[in-house]
Each structure stands twice: as C-alpha cells, then as structure tokens.
Amino acid sequence: MSGASEVPSFRWTQSLRRGLSHFTTSAKGDVLRDAKSLVDGLDFNQVSQVQRVMRKDKRSDDDLSKLRDLNRSVDSLMVMKNKQNNVSLKIGSLSKDELMDLATDLEKLKRKINLGDRQGPGVYQGNLTSAQLEKRSEILKSLGFQPRANQNGVVKVWDIKNPKLLINQFGSIPALTIACMSVQGAEQMNDVVQGLTSLGLLYTVKYPNLDDLDKLSKDHPCLEFITKEESANNISGYNLSLSAAVKAGACLVDGGNMLETILVKPDNFQDIVKSLLVVKRQEKMFVNEKPGLRNPYENILYKLCLSGEGWPYIGSRSQIVGRAWENTTVDLSKEVVYGPSAPVKNGGNMRLSPLSDTQEAVIKEAIGKLDMDETIWIDIEGPPNDPVELAIYQPSTGNYIHCFRVPHDEKGFKNGSKYSHGILLRDIENARSGLLSRILMRLPQKVVFTCQGSDDIQKLLQMNGRPDIATIDMSFSSEQARFFEGVVWEKFGHLCTRHNGVVLSRKKKGGNSGEPHCALLDCIIFQAAFEGQVTGQIPKPLLPNSLIFKDEPRVAM
C-alpha cells in the first residue's frame, strides 16, 4: 500500500469496507476447510524447497518450475480459487461515465505496474526505478557500505527466459498461511487460528505493525513464526510475512465487513464495480502511477478485474492467465444492448450475462407481448440497489412478468421479510441469476410504467442503465392503495407462492400486519384502487418457471 503521506490509506480501507459490505461473506469455514485439505494433501518437503528458492539471490527457470508446480498442487487441493472468467463491460448497469472512469483507472494501473516491472535481462527491480537503484547504490558506496540483495523490498533474482511465467504466481493465501504455520511450526491449527484472529481483530481498527506483532506473540506464541522482514511486491505465498498473517486474520473475523472476504460471481460483478466507483468518488480515491506498492483502491481494482469470478483477495489465482486490464475490458461502442449477444469466438472475452441465447430469446418474446400503448404497472420488493422481486403487469390483458433475485445483503433482506414482503431466503435461493436485470435492460425505450411510489422504481431503472424509461406515480394514500388488498388476496393469492414468512407490524409491537407485500399482487391491488373494482381478467404469466428458477422440478400429471 502507498505510504500514509500519499493517501489516507486506512481511512480508504474503512470506506471500502462500508461501501462494499453487501458483498462480503463469512469465509472462516471455507478457509479452514481448505487449510485442512492443504495440511493433509500438500508435500511440505516441496514447500521447504520453494521457501529456500525464495531466499536465493538468483533464481533460474528450474526454480520457477518448482514454484509453479507447487502452486498447481495448492490450487488442486483448494475449493477457494479464482476462475478465468474474462469480462467485457458495456453500457447498461454501468453508465458511460462510469465505464470511462474504470477504463482510465485500469490504464493508469497498467502503466504503474509495467513501469515497476521494467527490467534489464534477468533483473526484477521490485519497487524502485532504475534511477532510484543507481542513486541508492551511489549513496551506499559513498558511505562505505556494500549493497546487499533483498533490501528495501527489491528483488533482482529471476534470471529466466520468459518473465510472463511469473504473472499471478505470487501473493499470499490465508488457507496456505494457516497450513504452513500449523505444519512447519508444529502448532495446533486451533492455536494458529486464535493467534491470527487476534491479529485480524486489530486490523479492524488499524494496520498491525511489527510492534503489535511482538505484543500479540506473548499471548500467541505461534505468531513468532511470522517473519519480521518488510513485505515486498511479488512475495511468495509461502513466506510467512506480516501482511500474509493479517490477511489470514481478516478472513477469520466474523463480521467487520472485511474486504478480504468478498466473493465475486458473474451476476454481482457489475454491482461490485459500481459500488467501488461510488466509494472512489466519495473519498476522492485515485491511481498513483508512481511505481511502488498499491494503495487500497489500486489493490481492490486489480484484484476484482483479474478473474471476474472467485475470491479476489484470498483465493488461489496461480492458474489465472493475464493481467487485470487484459481480463476485464471496457466496450463503449454501443448503448443498451437489447438483442442477444453475438457468440463468443475461441479466445474471446465472455459476455457478462449468465443467461443463454435461448433464455434471452424467451425474455424478448415475453416483453414483446406487452402492449406499450396500454397501462403497465411495475413494482418491486426490497431496496432498489438490492431488489428481491420484480413484477410487471398489464391489466388490459392480464399478462405479467414476475421474477425473483437472491439478495446480496442477507441482514437487510431478513429485516424486509420480517416487516414487509415475508419472502424466505430458502424459497428463492434457486432464483435465476441475472434474470431481473436482463428483463430491465431488454425493455423498449418507449415504455412508460405506472407505479405506486416512483422513487425506488426510478432508482432501480437508473442503476440498471435505464434512465430513459418514464414512470407515472399514482401517489395513493396508504389506505387508498390497500383498499382491495383482502379481496385480491382471496381471489389471486394462489399466484403468490414465495411469501411464506410471518410479517410483523412496525406500529404494533408483536402484532401481525396481515398479508405480506407481493410485487405481483400489489400491482393488481393498485390497479383495483385505480378502477374502483377488482379485475375479472385472469393473470397470465409470460415467463416459464423453468426460466425464473434453476432446476425447477417438473411434475408429471
């Protein structure tokens, strides 16, 4: 990370934790499972050999082969790994300005890293430029000192034919750190976990330093195995450095919204990038093109964009090919894409949508059955930045589009379930990823939605790249809006099968407020309030359950 004189490093880290808290997970169980797998399956004689290699003043192609072979073994034993899922981002959920901002930062990051990697034959310069290395050498000579290798984080050792083979072979992995401390330190894994957890708890309020490590080591002797040498760029994952230990500790802390526990999936990648850019603007974060360690924003930007799927901070990434700016690209050539994407050629970037061409065609056909000249209601459940249900309903025909989405913020979801929609997570855990956003992206530009309360709907449309869609807010009072609620539930309640939780009243402690809020039935209820009567038109779904939910069981009649 950059020095405190350049950026308010820890403040940035805290801001990123808050801004990306919806995407953090409880990773402790997964980390310990992989650590046990490594303890049982890894050849620690090979680990010792690689550790010796990393202490050598000059390393050869044979040494690199040992490192890469061991990295492959580690990767094969782990569940927490990053997958090669190259992404091409287009205007949609991310606006043109956001994409340009992202592209600019990736280009700056590329220049920063390439400048730091610039080297003569067989020399890796680490954190210093050639001019800085020469100046340092002159100063040392003038003071009567002989320059020593491995000082100030500089590694000038890789005398190899193909430097590209070094890419993604470094970086610590918490499961590996725990396994090495347990086996090579002859410590009980539980003791190692306790020691690292203390380090992780300290990390929630400050960056732990060597003084902190010394003090914690008195209560946790296992921490004495952590090296006191300053961490450098491209340090091996087998080095028991302070930064590696802190990262491992962060994964073991329950809560704290630690960035290390972020899990990237194809359906939340754009959401994470969007949230990252929001925090960046709020804190005025930037990419510093000067060679050196990455600041918190540079660090998370690189890690997120490297693979597009997996655990960017703590998963194995040694099998990922390419750099962040190669694996995540920005395409500003088109506005909103309504039709199915073109097939991907071999070696090309994958499209971001998790849906197949056939599924995209079903969505397109369903939307085509809505009459854009007639009233169309829209309603959601959950906040606009994390919706769990979407309904689009046309009263004149009874046609409707209805889908669900697994939330990122489970705590907020449970609160919404308790006091509003009554959806249970188990009832929507197999909801199709990416469906809700693709429906919104495929809507034609001329559509005008009718709704009860437009603020959340407009935010939803804005966040999904559809600020062009207009809304009409009926602005009923609460009593007016829900006048026909009981009748509609009696007549059409069979359509609502995913709202099975008990809903409590916020006004009356312990009281039940009656029926949960279902986005589809709410559309019908609001239309009844507008017409003064409940419709006789039978609602007809436009999307099959097999698309709305993955592995939806088929019942033979």
From Swiss-Prot:
GO molecular function: hydrolase activity; metal ion binding; RNA binding
Entry's Gene Ontology cellular component terms: helical viral capsid; host cell cytoplasm; ribonucleoprotein complex; viral nucleocapsid
Pfam families attached to this UniProt entry: Arena_ncap_C, Arena_nucleocap
Location(s), subcellular: Virion; Host cytoplasm
UniProt binding sites for Zn(2+): 389, 496, 499, 518
Binding site for Mn(2+): 379, 381, 522
Site feature (Important for exonuclease activity) residues: 456
Primary residence: virion
Record bears the keyword Flavoprotein: no
Enzyme Commission number(s) from the entry: 3.1.13.-
Bridged cysteine pairs (disulfide): none
Region of interest (Binding site for the cap structure m7GTP), residue spans: 54-235
Keyword Transmembrane (UniProt): no
Family the entry assigns: Belongs to the arenaviridae nucleocapsid protein family.
UniProt remark on domains: The N-terminal region is important for the cap-binding activity while the C-terminal region contains the 3'-5' exoribonuclease activity. A CCHE zinc binding site is present in the C-terminal region and may thus contribute to the substrate binding and/or the specificity of the exonuclease activity.
Subunit description: Homomultimerizes to form the nucleocapsid. Binds to viral genomic RNA. Interacts with glycoprotein G2. Interacts with protein Z; this interaction probably directs the encapsidated genome to budding sites. Interacts with protein L; this interaction does not interfere with Z-L interaction. Interacts with host IKBKE (via Protein kinase domain); the interaction inhibits IKBKE kinase activity.
Protein name: Nucleoprotein
Gene name in the database record: N
